[in-house]
């Protein structure tokens, strides 16, 4: 347990930030899963629509610091490639 007042404050702050970050990551995963479900069903229009909603959420994760830029780019790129492959 922390002894300094500032360290005790940081423990509380870290816990609350961790909770918020966990919620953000869960939100991103939910949107990505919706895209993956649409891809699995083979509905290209639904997949594109879900992708257009999910893409800004993934980028917001980068802005908020819960995802690395390369991770977000990789997710977006792979989802986009899978959507394009539906029609081919």
From Swiss-Prot:
Per its UniProt record, what Gene3D superfamilies does this chain match? Ribosomal protein S20 (1.20.58.110)
Taxonomy, superkingdom: Bacteria
Q: Name one GO cellular component term.
A: small ribosomal subunit
GO BP terms = translation
Q: Which UniProt keywords apply?
A: Ribonucleoprotein, Ribosomal protein, RNA-binding, rRNA-binding
- Task of the protein: Binds directly to 16S ribosomal RNA.
Q: Which family does it belong to?
A: Belongs to the bacterial ribosomal protein bS20 family.
The name this protein carries in UniProt is Small ribosomal subunit protein bS20
Species of provenance: Rhodospirillum rubrum (strain ATCC 11170 / ATH 1.1.1 / DSM 467 / LMG 4362 / NCIMB 8255 / S1)
